[in-house]
Amino acid sequence: MSKKRTIALTISAIAVALGIGAQFYTNHKIDQVLKNFPYTLDNQATLNVTQTAKNFFMRELIFSVKDSDAKSTNVISTKLTALPFFITAESQLSDQLVRQLNKTLNITIDKNTINSKFSPVGDYLQSDILTEFRDFANKSQNLSIGLHFLKNKEVELKTTLSGFNYDKDTKLEEIDGEARLVPVGANQYDLSSIDLTAKNAEVALLNGENTHVYMKNATYHFDVKPGEADKRDLSTKFSSDILRVANKSRTTEESQATAGGLNLLVKQNGVPSSINFHHEFKKLSDGSLSIKDGVNLLTKIFTQNDRFDSSLSVLSVNVPKNNQPYFNLQNAGLELKLANTDLTKANVDFKLNVESVKQTPADEERKWEAKGGKVNIQLDDYNVANELAFVPFLLDTIAEKEAPAKDNKDFLNAKDKWVKEFSGKTNIEAALKSFNMADLVLDDVSASDKTETLDNDQYNEHITLSANKASYPSAGFQFEKLAIDAPFKINHSKAHLSARFCS
């Protein structure tokens, strides 16, 4: 045997040995990964895997998901091909999942391909999912999803959807989305962030009877950051260039309320990890959310946290009547901040600013316009818990068709508790640059009301009112440089509060 042939055979033998060794290593890594299952996803679902076939180069797997109701669904069947230091996978959606998706989403899946690559050395995974389907309107749509398992163990998903007609009331066009899952423990992932954009969206809430919403160039962002002691910090942003609201009496675009340049920001710090709004929002989307459920949901969003910060701004709002301009709002914004660590001594800060607002009914005498409106409300060390205690009674009153025959003892006890524990400071300020309605004219009007509870059953109240001009000729009065300053000290404040409550 020649020397060159001997060297070549030796090199080949080394290569085969290394390849076999790498193959053993690759299979070892696959076994390690499979042992990590099941995985928990955001406390809402469990991902499991079953190995149905195996040899030195190939594995066949079935992935299944079990939801919070313990219902299990096979989602993907995968054929792994293990090469030295490299793995490829060909996958397809299970027949069970395809049938479920077709039924749930009103679609027909025509084609679906899933291609994956995985390196056991670098712990890198990339999957591309391409789906062609026909929606409710029998329109062909394309969905692409890219999944990346990053080196820091985080999971990144990117998706593009050409469009989707779910039913006659819900339609989406050109949707792009990104989501990120982060590891929070052994075999457990939580949602970290979501970003969605839509060129056009038409959504029906509460069955669309009174809340049919159209959006153009809408964006949605949500992220979660871990806080202290099993708490999380949540942030939600929403914007839409145009938002139109329709109902059964406003069916044409010309008759619908329209908001332009809408921006919403909500931050909730210190939300207990045990709280999950998923089920409540699910009720909202399918129309089963009652008024009571809705109020309870809002109460949770506002108060079940250590701090709540929110802002809402809009460039314009137009509400027509009989297809004619009727109500117009320009450049309005509000802010609400709540310090909720102790709801018996909460701090509330509310601000509202409006550049201009006007109403133009057919009757000239009823037309009015206001400019430069401002409202500031501050509550310090205020017992919000006692205020919230009346919400269930209010909801019951709304539901009752007849007045109760006798007083509700629980309500009276709540009232007595409210009077006894009433405390804190309040500061309410309002200002208006101008107001015009027929011959009523107001110019530079401002008012304030400040209160503070004191010891010995007393509290202070200070009321002010000023106006540069107030003119109403048809009523026979006109004021200029009006100023009222009225400080009070109230004795027997508990009795006064009780009487004021009943009034």
Task: Identify the residue ranges that each predicted region occupies.
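Glycine-rich, small/hydroxylated-residue low-complexity segments
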Residues: 24-27, 31-503
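Hydrophobic membrane-insertion alpha-helices, especially the h-region
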Residues: 7-23
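Bacterial Sec-dependent N-terminal signal peptides
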Residues: 1-6
